[in-house]
Amino acid sequence: PIKLYRKACFDEIGGLQACLGWDSIDQWLVQFWGWQVKTFTSLKVKHLKATGQDYRPGQLSNQGRAFAHMGYGFWLSLLSLVKLGIYHKNPKLVHNGLIQYWRHRNALMVSKEQAKFIRKSLWYSILNNR
């Protein structure tokens, strides 16, 4: 997939964040400001570099930092890291991810109000199986 934004939407979300997790932050902010996220499966895009190509196994623990940037809070970060650890069959990912989360827990890349919106949306999705 490729991300496209209306100019007004892009301006309202403040552009793209220069941080780990930017590709999730923009989607949360789009929803926070009341814009819609749409996927056009008929649009054909050729990526010259595969998504995630530069990831190395150790970088997955940086997800804890990304969760801190997005304001997930401890419990959502823990749940997300456990899910990643199970998916990648790597229990160390949970431990290392929590260390990264703890180190960066005060480095929000969104406002407190936006972080609250993100947490509320995530809990709703989890509790309603969406």
Q: Where on the chain are the PLM-derived regions?
A:
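A short, conserved alpha-helix in the catalytic core of glycosyltransferases
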Residues: 9-12, 19-49
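General secondary-structure edge motif
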Residues: 10, 58-59
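Short, surface-exposed loop/turn motifs that are enriched in glycine and acidic residues
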Residues: 15-20, 64-68
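Non-catalytic, C-terminal membrane-associated alpha-helical segments of glycosyltransferases
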Residues: 59-130
